[in-house]
Curated annotation (Swiss-Prot):
Residues involved in ATP binding: 353-361, 375
Name this polypeptide is given: Probable bifunctional tRNA threonylcarbamoyladenosine biosynthesis protein
Compartment(s) of residence: Cytoplasm
Enzyme Commission code(s) on record: 2.3.1.234, 2.7.11.1
Organism for this UniProt entry: Methanosarcina barkeri (strain Fusaro / DSM 804)
InterPro entries xref list: ATPase_NBD, Bud32, Gcp-like_dom, KAE1/TsaD, Kae1_archaea_euk, Kinase-like_dom_sf, Prot_kinase_dom, RIO_dom
Keyword presence, RNA-binding: no
Residues the record lists as binding Fe cation: 113, 117, 134, 290
Length: 545
């Protein structure tokens, strides 16, 4: 059988890179990297760099391929990074791809840059159906495949982790790229400095962390600030990845994107996966940053599934979302799925009910033989001890206080019996998380519950279908560790956005679920329309920048 040969061109930002691949082999790859004289990336200068070197990169690539017996006439398609990325750079690369397509008389394939990072990781590791932590300059996302798309479980609400690191590095007068310099300085630190740790459900925010780190430089050594920045930011993304693992029930984590070259981040992810019994995969470093091979290989998958473009449809998209892409090359029946459960499952005292991202949950016997649920926030080996103890203590107290307060406002929650430093004892409710059986009717009831919560001035902070329990005809809200008091539109909007993101990433009927939620939310919360409008604004904000 004849091999399929695809030529791919990457050029979303810094790197102009082209490669030729088959299903099993990288034939050749040539890269020219834009290096600004000072500061960060200048989109127009980067595009000029790509235009200057495009012809020579392709010429060198074809020459290397010829040495391996691959002629231009053997190439079956031209793949290019269609987005997301910097508009001027994308347009330059698309022009080069169109010219090659016309001259060779072969189809074009428009590749999503983010998905290419995922597919190269799956190709170059044993990963089959992973939760993906994708961290690059402009992107920070937790992603997994479901129902014909790569779904985004959580992402940055402001700035990508790589750009946040670079921004801090520039303020500290460190040369570009900032990430490796921060990593090097962090190795010589002697002290951890308290910095803000911001997680909103499965979403993240890095802007406040960067500002606080820059302020800390006025009083603390650079080494200590770099170390503290890394430990805090990386713990945040690892926790969000663990939350996605717990929610989906998947057993693999794949690290993708340029920030993934950081040794400490890899170490933390490996520690988290070992503790959960999950497998951790990361491709070799040459495939972590932007490269032509990932575009070529993803283009090959798309080509073989009949996914090509006409010239008229080859316009670039600087804001091309991961979850906008119809994934035509994955066979659904081969993917692992979370086993469903049903009410009435027999549970034994002391048996582990749940190993969540926050805590382990088990039963113990209370007075008169009554079952009591124990939620214990165990140490996380991947987190620096001071961060870990602070988070566990704060969340334990917050959960006890706001869960009880929510009950007083008509929101069904378990009754808290006792509070210890890292442990809660509460009413055991024999129910099922709605992630296994959510319907539009249930979603409408969820909307009513959240409306009552917001009317009381409480923001849950972690609204997912894993944290809502159905017992009989009643819904219970669980896991208030990230909850807080806030009557602002932004806080309430993020709260609802997190839930909608869970619907979209996990449930095939997400559109019906969202509309049903809105109906119930409007019924119990007077300012619902303002919040729902803000949700749309937040959704647009969480885009490639």
């Amino acid at each position: 059988m004849k091999n399929t040969f695809i030529l791919g061109i990457e050029g979303t930002a810094w790197n102009l890179s082209a490669a030729i691949v088959t299903e099993t082999e990288i034939i050749a790859e040539v890269t020219e990297t834009y290096k600004p004289t000072a500061g960060g990336i200048h989109p127009r200068e980067a595009a000029q760099h790509h235009a200057k070197y495009a012809a020579s990169v392709i010429k060198r690539l074809l020459a290397e391929a010829k040495e391996k017996g691959v002629k231009p006439s053997d190439i079956d398609g031209i793949a290019f990074s269609q987005g997301p990325g910097l508009g001027p750079c994308l347009r330059t690369v698309a022009t080069a791809a169109r010219m090659l397509s016309i001259s060779l008389g072969i189809p074009l394939i428009g590749v999503n840059h983010c998905i290419a990072h995922i597919e190269i990781g799956i190709w170059r590791t044993p990963a089959m159906d992973p939760v993906v932590l994708y961290v690059s300059g402009a992107n920070s996302q937790v992603i997994s495949y479901m129902g014909g798309r790569y779904r985004v479980f959580g992402e940055t609400l402001d700035i990508g982790l790589g750009n946040a690191l670079d921004k801090f590095a520039r303020g500290a007068n460190l040369p570009h790229p900032g990430g490796p310099k921060i990593e090097a300085y962090a190795k010589n630190a002697t002290k951890y400095i308290h910095l803000p740790y911001v997680i909103k459900g499965m979403d993240l925010s890095f802007s406040g962390l960067s500002t606080a780190a820059s302020e800390a430089l006025k009083k603390a050594p650079l080494e200590d600030v770099c170390y503290s920045y890394q430990e805090t930011a990386f713990a945040m993304v690892v926790e969000v990845a663990e939350r996605a693992l717990a929610h989906t029930g998947k057993k693999e984590v794949l690290l993708a994107g340029g920030v993934g070259a950081n040794t400490r981040l890899r170490e933390m992810l490996n520690d988290m996966c070992e503790a959960r019994g999950a497998k951790f995969y990361v491709p070799e470093k040459r495939f972590m940053g932007d490269n032509g091979t990932m575009i070529a290989y993803t283009g090959l998958l798309m080509y073989k599934s009949g996914n090509t473009l006409s010239l008229e449809d080859s316009r670039v998209n600087p804001s091309y979302r991961t979850d906008d892409v119809k994934v035509t090359w994955i066979q659904e029946e081969k993917m692992k799925r979370v086993p469903e459960i049903s009410p009435g499952t027999s549970l034994k005292l002391g048996e582990l009910l749940d190993n969540g991202a926050e805590a382990i949950v088990y039963l113990e016997e209370g007075p008169e033989g009554k079952k009591i649920l124990v939620k214990e926030r165990v140490p996380k080996a991947y987190r620096y001890k001071e961060i870990d103890e602070r988070i566990r203590t704060e969340r334990n107290r917050t959960e006890a206080r706001l869960m009880s307060e929510s009950r007083r406002h008509g929101v069904s929650t378990p009754i808290i019996y006792d509070v210890e430093d890292f442990k809660l004892k509460m009413q055991y409710i024999d129910g099922v998380p709605i992630k296994y059986l959510v319907t539009p009717e249930l979603s409408e009831k969820v909307g009513e519950l959240v409306g009552k919560l917001h009317s009381a001035g409480i923001v849950h902070g972690d609204l997912t279908t894993s944290n809502i329990l159905l017992a009989g005809e009643r819904l219970y809200l669980l896991d208030f560790g990230l909850a807080y008091y806030d009557k602002g539109l932004e806080a309430r909007g993020v709260d609802v956005h997190v839930l909608f993101q869970t619907f979209e990433s996990t449930h095939r009927n997400h559109e019906a679920l969202i509309e049903a939620f809105k109906k119930g939310y409007r019924r119990t919360f007077i300012d619902s329309e303002d919040v729902l409008t803000r949700v749309e604004e937040i959704k647009k904000r969480a885009r490639y920048a």
